[in-house]
Amino acid sequence: MGQKVNPYGFRLGITTDHVSRWFSDSTKKGQRYSDYLAEDVKIRTLLKTSLDRAGVSRIEIERTRDRVRVDIHTARPGIVIGRRGAEAERIRADLEKLSGKQIQLNILEVKNPEADAQLVAQGIAEQLAARVAFRRAMRKGLQGAQRAGSKGVRIQVSGRLGGAEMSRSEFYREGRVPLHTLRANIDYGFYEAKTTFGRLGVKVWMYKGDITNKELARVQANVKPSRERNDRPRRGGRGSNAPEASTVPAAAGVEA
């Protein structure tokens, strides 16, 4: 299970949080859950396309009644802001045109790009697109992540490696990467490299330690207990061995 599932979704509410924060129960067109979800996808697609070289690690979206707040976590904030903020204004105008709402754009710098799995995956993909040998690019990313203080790193590259006819996958791993441990803080990143031989997929897992017992207890306290099935009365009918209760009151016995 832990080897296949996305580490973010697997640990949602334990070590990770939602990247879109809003609520909708309206049935009006333009305010439905599906409308907001489709709008989020369009916003992320637009930003990833226009900021392909800006080293975007994460995009967070938060909504109020008449405003959308977009937080862009990037390793190169100068590219996103542009000269005298011209690029940021252009991005804000494009987002307002797309959503039809007021956009609050926040640009946040990632202090340590080598400790961010998404940025490491993007860096390896850029090297592969520049015809760097895939093993060399993987080792370079592995060494940088270890220097940044990660307790364990796993990097996997899949596709027509080296221009081979048959696609395959290769990975390097250093340290521990416990994907089954829910309390393990696993950072995950994925990026595609576009080469002359086709696309290569790059995946990066980083293990940054476990959350403490106090933090785990606080998370578990916030989770509502599941509803027990035993508190409901059993229904009779087919498959039920319990005798049906008689609705006729029992007659009182009289001793002779």
UniProtKB/Swiss-Prot annotation:
Chain intervals with Basic and acidic residues compositional bias: 225-234
PROSITE patterns xref list: KH_TYPE_2, RIBOSOMAL_S3
MF annotations from Gene Ontology: mRNA binding; rRNA binding; structural constituent of ribosome
Pfam families, A to Z: KH_2, Ribosomal_S3_C
GO cellular component: cytosolic small ribosomal subunit
SUPFAM superfamilies hit by this protein: Prokaryotic type KH domain (KH-domain type II), Ribosomal protein S3 C-terminal domain
NCBIfam families with a match to the protein in the record: rpsC_bact
PANTHER family: 30S/40S RIBOSOMAL PROTEIN S3, SMALL RIBOSOMAL SUBUNIT PROTEIN US3C
Role played: Binds the lower part of the 30S subunit head. Binds mRNA in the 70S ribosome, positioning it for translation.
Name of the featured protein: Small ribosomal subunit protein uS3
